[in-house]
């Protein structure tokens, strides 16, 4: 059974790098440049994990995470950021 990852990051280089890394390990990837683009294709039957950038134009990663939780999403989520700090990390983990 193929594993799946959904990458949501506004930085194309990050999306490309993560796609290359994960696909080289046998993980199928779908990447999205924004939270809105991911939401346009998301449905509750998706399986795998979601990798979210914390800071994006438009809807942020934590905002997308909250919305997905409200919609009943049970997929594991990994947060990434190049601009993190301890309070931001604690806030994301508490949700």
Stretch-by-stretch model annotation:
Residues 26-33, 41, 59:
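Short hydrophobic/Thr-rich beta-strand motif most characteristic of the beta2 strand and flanking loop
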Residues 45-51:
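Active-site beta3 strand of CheY-like receiver
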Residues 71, 83-84:
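Short, conserved "switch-loop" micro-motifs in signal-transduction and mechanochemical regulators
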Residues 53, 81:
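Active-site residues of response regulator receiver
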Residues 12-30:
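Two-component/phosphorelay signaling modules centered on CheY-like receiver
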Residues 56:
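Receiver (REC) domain active-site loop signature in two-component systems and cognate sites
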Residues 40, 62-73, 91:
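Short amphipathic alpha-helix used as the core "switch/output" element in two-component signaling
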Residues 33-34, 59-64, 84:
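Acidic catalytic/metal-coordinating carboxylates
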